[in-house]
Amino acid sequence: MKQSNNQVGEKVLVLGAGQLGASVLASLVPAVTQRNGSVCIIVSGRSRDKQSKRRSSIHQQLADAGARFIPVDIADSSVAALKDQFHGFDTIINCMGFVAGAGTQIKITRAVLEAGVKRYFPWQFGVNYDVVGKGSGQPVWDEQYDVGTLLREQNVTEWVIVSTGLFTSFLFEPAFGVVNLAQKTINALGGWEMQVTVTSPADIGRLTTEIYLHQPRITNEVVFVAGETTSYAKLAETVERVTQQTFTRGVLTQPDLQEQLRLHPHDPMLRYRVAFARGDGMWWPMSDTWNAQHHLPTQDIAAWLKTHQ
């Protein structure tokens, strides 16, 4: 791992200010500005209304804190156009997610490299794509693997991948099919012994800023963080203990999920369930996480649930 010192006065660009981007920016903007740096944020041109007012109060708060917004439609932009937008920034943190469509993450990464950006945090805030590899049943994950390969094949731009597991809230998304608080059901993906790592967006934002600032500087490394790593059996116990309710339990086995996927190959949530039922790459021990090793507290599932039930 190459090490170098953080410089004051850095120009940082964040791509996206949605759920994760806003969480990252809440910690990042004050940290960078205190060091005489600047933060710019690329968002869609649709982020303003017809009167040129910001549609999001969060965007307005970030602007008031000193961040500058740049309207760019990344999905419709070429690599060359993005290269021009990215040129001159010291660090780019990609919080765009998958909403911009297939191929976008590779396009962004190529533009970052062609622009000669010093340091890049790609959109890899998820599972361990190196372990998952290709053919997981989730096509966008194949692209994530390719992004990692592209970064490792070059030596101009430093990169940092922050692996977070699932957003904690996603476990409780009814469409995902794991915990449904309204219907009081819990399904294990693959089996009750299977494990999953989760982190809240607020913790991801705070930890990403800490990793960005850390000395010696972290470069060319996958950094694992987590709010909690749990088995589905322990998850069921946690949910019932916190809610003081009894939940109906079920298991979605890998063969059953594969058969459902054969019948409904374009169902995105079903593809997620198939991928997580594999187990490999979906979790890591808390003792291996950067936050645990640096004694930084994070929100576990019980704490998250107490504030969201």
Give residue ranges: language-model regions.
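A hydrophobic C-terminal alpha-helical subdomain
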Residues: 254-309
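Oxidoreductase cofactor-interface core, primarily capturing Rossmann-like NAD(P)-dependent enzymes
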Residues: 2-38, 42-57, 77, 115, ...
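Hydrophobic beta-strand scaffold residues
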Residues: 69, 119, 158-159
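Conserved residues at the C-terminal ends of beta-strands
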Residues: 95, 123, 165
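Short beta-strand elements of ligand-binding domains
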Residues: 118-124
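Short, amphipathic alpha-helical "lid/cap" segments that border enzyme active or binding sites
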Residues: 83, 201-209, 298-306
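NAD(P)H-binding glycine-rich loop region in Rossmannoid oxidoreductase-like domains
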Residues: 50-115, 129-132
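Structural motif
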Residues: 11, 90-91, 119
